[in-house]
């Protein structure tokens, strides 16, 4: 799972955050959802974040999006989508083919999970995880539009996959992280998501947070 990531406004992510905060519907989104437009620091589910997606002309743009797909009858939104089943799941199928996005982050957080002698899963130490030799973690995601009181706004979910060797010691899932060179292809309407994810990054570094 991926339920936390960090966006450092003092470094390479500032242009993305600035663009999202200045989007034409950003203020209305903040008011309608009663959420701040901070978009930096530790980002949690239901926060508004800066997300890369295609504009109407097909060009890359950055928009404010809320983290999590709302599901009728569920109190909490779905924040992750399993890459193995996203193309078939009714919740994500349309987004998989038509609405893909990228979440620029400094790193993501994960908590170590381990089994007790009695077989119970416990949560251990918190780790910051990012690609080796990269200042930006390009997290693959899906998005769609939801509506509240007549206001339509975008929401996103993070795609997850089986962990790389480096991550497998602390968790059984990790986000799909793209190389920078694949960002435009991933969000393109004519992109082939099954082919693009083959370039996903698995060489990651971890440190205790």
Write out the residue ranges for each language-model feature.
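Short linear sequence motif anchored by a di-proline
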Residues: 1-209
